[in-house]
């Protein structure tokens, strides 16, 4: 299963970072193994770091270390989306922000109207 971040438990309850088992929809449809994180660029925290869906940088680094080595992070900024065309095996980014694909020490961002093949993700 692809991992899911328990946002409420970490942000509101104060639990230490951990992953839950997800339903693996992205990988089963596209072959792309990634934990999807919405609100990747959140800035509503004022003096608190709420990037990475309210996890903040410190907890996000801890979460990354807990991911299996073959799992990437697909970060989706606020007011941004990504559409997957299963027939053409491609994805298109839309909206005001970017999507971030990160695996290990490698990271790449894609902005509005970027079109990528599934292979670009798989070769990452």
Go through each PLM region and give its residues.
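Solvent-exposed alpha-helices and their adjacent loops that cap or buttress functional pockets
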Residues: 25-29, 65-67, 74-75
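Class I SAM-dependent methyltransferase SAM-binding "motif I" and its flanking Rossmann-like core
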Residues: 1-49
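A structural signal for short, well-ordered beta-strand segments and their strand-loop junctions
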Residues: 35, 73-76
